[in-house]
């Protein structure tokens, strides 16, 4: 499914720069066992591979604060998009990130 969070898949969701600066990766906001649900519900964003996704100081995989902010933002988007309550979201993703 297309992302319900990000329309412009040619720009990094975190820094806003175009992908030609560095390749973009599709990041599933809720990973691990919830990766398929992230895909199913469109909870994905595009991030610069090194700087914003994996290795940078402010990348989602190295900076827990940034990752949690993205998860909270994605939860709000999902609740708005699907008309879910917090309880509905927890039924799908097992946790409240707000």
Q: What is each model feature region?
A:
Residues 1-25, 50:
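Short cysteine-rich loop/turn motifs with clustered Cys
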Residues 1-7, 65, 96-98:
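Short, Lys/Arg-enriched, disordered terminal segments
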Residues 22-25, 43-47, 74:
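Amphipathic alpha-helical interface surfaces
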Residues 24-32, 49-55:
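Histidine-centered catalytic micro-motifs
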Residues 30-44:
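Short linker/helix segments within small regulatory modules
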Residues 33, 64, 72:
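Small/polar glycine-rich anion-binding or flexible loop at a beta-alpha turn
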Residues 44-69:
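Short Cys/His-centered divalent metal-binding micro-motifs
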Residues 71-98:
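Short flanking/linker segments adjacent to small metal-binding domains or redox-active Cys/His motifs
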